[in-house]
């Protein structure tokens, strides 16, 4: 570009003359040249030639100006990059020349070098020699402290070029890089590329230099303690080295290679690897098989496949070996079949093919058994695998092997370490015993099944619940064979024996003692006793059941379900008062309010069903809802009491006490109101209270509506609208119901007052309020006139304006937009500040703008 012939008339205009005069007067002033360039660049008519005309003269005058050269180079690069026309070689070389000129005096400017090298890589990737020479020249001129700026580009160039050039670049980087960086210990330090020695090895292999890669592998494997920071573990590096050797052997066709020595070296390498990584048996055996397949030594390949399957200890290794083994055999069979087709009938080859086919089929069929054996070698206490093994033999209908497997499992498993990795409920040690006994029971061999159960309950287990399961199944064995007496003897022997006082959860006590307090076993015992009763005349049997229930209560193992079952049993045999006493006993035993609520719920329903004295029932309802004589009971919690109040109210109504029914619902609202203000309720419980409160309002309103007492109905609606605890959606729903009620009565002034009230509750544009405005408009169209419609529109404009002012005020007071928490909806300040309208004799008595 320096050799261009300039057309002065085409490059200069009258506006340029002052700037030309300045640079002519003081050509060595950088500011003059920069002002001139910036002015010219800002004009719409400025072309690439205009810029170059100024910059070329500037850099000639100030050849050491880094700033001018950078501007010049950026202009040239931009022109080359944005030009849509074909770029000739001469144009590219002219850009090269600009860079070369700049670097003659600024050869220590890394940014110039980077721009130059990036340009060369992008536009002249085929000039390998030029690129390599310029990279080396750059590294030679720049101080070593700045080399880290160049190496990323140099490495990218090496990756693109590959081959021996790429190898030389990476080996050169190997000399430059910090040893700690190569070891993966200090890759975050400034100037490090994050390239480790294993990355370099990968590149050397990719570029075809196996010899250099092998040297680096050996160096790493001999000093694994120094390379702990690498992204690849020593195991990964070891396997990569093995793969490298396998691939190099398969490519080596020279007859001078001593394969026997190489085989010995390779097998020794694998054995050394097994010593270092004993948990990688499968993977290393697989490498051996691949090696001998490459060597076409199929006998040794099969030998190591079999050895691998016998010694591997992980599913991953087993799957890899087995899949590779089957693929290997399939390929052999395919090759033999193709060979047989070409040769025609060949008895020897045919026999060999049949033999190999049988071996292959056996290998496929044995897979689940081989895998199961491997899993049991890995963990003999894994119940899942023992159950799988039994299922395998069951599918084959091999009863003898099933029984042998049961016996082997129960003989081998440590009961205190038995577990199910899959967390399957059915895969338990008790079920192993039970299934074992059931094999004989299914063949009507009750004697052997009984013997197995008798041995099972003497074994150790991890929890008393396991032992209880065995006792239950043992009893079921005799129940199924119509020997209920023997079943009861077995369970009574354990449940009624004297054991003294102990804690069921005390792990220091033998489970054979703790099982006496197993509610699971007691529940079965109770069910068994109850099943023996057929009529009311069996007094002794009934008393025996009652006594058993009382023992569970005395042992303090009764659950809420036990109490309910006890009460149901007594009710079933017409012991009603004793049934009610059972419920009351449960209320005394259990302290949890939710449990008490459930018991009360059932108790009250039952006592209403039997139509006892009304005062007694009322007294029970009052005890349930409020503090009672029951120790530690302070009344039903507010978040649970709604069903009780509804049941109580419905009961009173069914007895003709309508006023009391309504009063009870009002009491419920009061209790919920007080409960919502208590701090000990959680947010979720308070949300429940609000929902229950709204539901009670709905029930209360529906009751009053049936009376056709308009004044009482209005009072309830007004009460609900004054309730500041209800949510906005609830208030809106109640208001709209109130509006419909007044509309049916043609109390239009009241309706308008209600519309005004509800429309003030939130922003007129909110999704909740906007439909209400539409309803109001519809109402005025149907029942109003032009004046009332205009009044509605004026009110709407006022509300919109007030809300806009309210928002502006809030934003000015709280510019960060923090929101203060609140409880329930609050009526807008509009309702407070709005002027009162004239008194309306038909208006509703609410705290709202009417």
UniProtKB/Swiss-Prot annotation:
Top-rank taxon, per record: Eukaryota
Gene3D superfamilies: Tetratricopeptide repeat domain (1.25.40.10)
SUPFAM superfamilies with a match to the protein in the record: TPR-like
Keywords for this protein: mRNA processing, mRNA splicing, Nucleus, Repeat, Spliceosome
Subcellular location: Nucleus
Main localization category: nucleus
Any Gene Ontology biological process: generation of catalytic spliceosome for first transesterification step
Family listed: Belongs to the crooked-neck family.
Protein name, as recorded: Pre-mRNA-splicing factor SYF1
Gene behind the chain: SYF1
């Amino acid at each position: 570009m320096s050799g261009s012939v300039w057309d002065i008339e085409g490059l200069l205009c009258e506006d340029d003359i002052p700037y030309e005069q300045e640079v002519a007067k003081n050509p060595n002033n950088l500011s003059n040249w920069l002002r001139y360039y910036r002015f010219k660049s800002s004009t719409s008519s400025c072309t690439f030639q205009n810029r170059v005309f100024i910059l070329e003269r500037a850099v000639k005058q100030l050849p050491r100006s880094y700033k001018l050269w950078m501007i010049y180079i950026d202009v040239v690069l931009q022109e080359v990059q944005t030009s849509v026309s074909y770029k000739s070689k001469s144009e590219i070389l002219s850009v090269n020349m600009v860079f070369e000129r700049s670097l003659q005096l600024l050869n220590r400017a890394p940014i110039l070098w980077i721009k130059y090298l990036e340009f060369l890589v992008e536009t002249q990737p085929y000039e390998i020699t030029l690129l390599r020479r310029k990279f080396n020249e750059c590294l030679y001129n720049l101080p070593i402290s700045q080399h880290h700026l160049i190496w990323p580009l140099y490495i990218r160039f090496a990756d693109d070029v590959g081959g021996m050039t790429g190898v030389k670049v990476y080996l050169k980087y190997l000399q430059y890089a910090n040893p700690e960086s190569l070891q993966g210990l200090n890759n975050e330090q400034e100037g490090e590329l994050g390239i480790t020695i294993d990355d370099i090895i990968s590149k050397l292999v990719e570029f075809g230099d196996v010899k250099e890669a092998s040297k680096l592998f050996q160096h790493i494997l001999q000093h694994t303690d120094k390379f702990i920071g690498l992204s690849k573990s020593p195991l990964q590096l070891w396997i990569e080295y093995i793969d490298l050797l396998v691939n190099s052997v398969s490519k080596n066709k020279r007859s001078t290679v001593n394969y026997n020595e190489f085989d010995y070296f390779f097998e020794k390498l694998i054995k050394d690897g097994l010593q270092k990584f004993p948990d990688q048996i499968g993977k290393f055996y697989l490498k051996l098989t691949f090696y001998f397949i490459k060597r076409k030594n199929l006998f040794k390949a099969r030998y190591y496949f079999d050895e691998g399957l016998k010694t591997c200890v992980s599913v991953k290794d087993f799957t890899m070996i087995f899949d590779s083994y089957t693929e290997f055999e399939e390929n052999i069979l395919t090759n033999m079949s193709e060979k047989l087709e070409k040769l025609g009938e060949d008895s020897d080859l045919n026999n060999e093919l049949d033999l190999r086919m049988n071996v292959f089929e056996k290998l496929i069929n044995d897979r689940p058994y081989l895998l199961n054996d491997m899993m049991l070698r890995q963990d003999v206490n894994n119940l899942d695998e023992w159950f799988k093994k039994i299922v395998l033999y069951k599918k084959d209908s091999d009863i003898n092997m099933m029984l042998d497997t049961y016996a082997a499992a129960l003989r081998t498993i440590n009961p205190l370490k038995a577990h199910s990795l899959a967390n399957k409920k059915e895969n338990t040690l008790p079920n192993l015993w039970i299934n074992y006994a059931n094999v004989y029971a299914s063949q009507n061999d009750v004697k052997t099944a009984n013997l197995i159960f008798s041995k099972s309950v003497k074994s150790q287990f991890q929890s008393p619940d396991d032992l209880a399961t065995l006792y239950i199944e043992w009893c079921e064995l005799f129940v199924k064979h119509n020997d209920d007496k023997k079943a009861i003897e077995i369970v009574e022997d354990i449940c009624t024996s004297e054991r003294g006082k102990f804690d069921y959860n005390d792990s220091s006590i033998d489970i054979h003692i703790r099982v006496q307090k197993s509610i699971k076993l007691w529940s079965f015992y109770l069910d068994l006793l109850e099943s023996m009763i057929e009529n009311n005349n069996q007094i002794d049997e009934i008393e025996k059941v009652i006594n058993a229930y009382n023992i569970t209560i005395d042992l303090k193992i009764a659950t809420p379900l036990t109490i309910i079952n006890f009460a149901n049993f007594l009710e079933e045999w017409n012991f009603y008062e004793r049934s009610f006493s059972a419920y009351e006993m449960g209320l005394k035993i259990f302290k949890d309010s939710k449990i008490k609520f459930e018991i009360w719920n059932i108790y009250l329903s039952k006592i209403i069903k039997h139509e006892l004295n009304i005062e007694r029932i009322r007294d029970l309802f009052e005890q349930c809802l409020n503090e009672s004589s029951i120790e530690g009971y302070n009344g039903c919690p507010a978040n649970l009491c709604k069903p009780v109040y509804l049941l109580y109210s419905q009961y009173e109504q069914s007895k003709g006490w309508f006023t009391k029914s309504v009063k009870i619902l009002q009491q419920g609202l009061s209790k919920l109101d007080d409960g919502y203000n208590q701090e000990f309720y959680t947010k979720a419980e308070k949300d429940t209270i609000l929902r229950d409160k709204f539901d009670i309002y709905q029930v209360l309103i529906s009751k009053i509506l049936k009376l056709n007492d308009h004044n009482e109905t209005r009072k309830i609606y007004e009460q609900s609208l004054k309730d500041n605890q209800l949510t906005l959606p609830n208030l809106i729903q109640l208001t709209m119901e109130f509006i419909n009620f007044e509309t049916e009565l043609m109390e239009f002034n009241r309706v308008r007052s209600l519309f005004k009230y509800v429309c003030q509750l939130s922003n007129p544009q909110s999704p909740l309020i906007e439909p209400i405005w539409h309803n109001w408009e519809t109402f005025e169209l149907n029942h109003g006139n032009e004046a009332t419609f205009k009044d509605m529109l004026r009110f709407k404009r006022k509300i919109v304006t007030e809300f806009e002012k309210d928002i502006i005020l809030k934003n000015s007071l709280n510019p960060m937009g923090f929101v203060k928490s609140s409880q329930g909806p609050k009526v807008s300040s509009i309702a407070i500040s709005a002027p009162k309208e004239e008194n309306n004799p038909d208006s509703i008595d609410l705290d709202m703008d009417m």
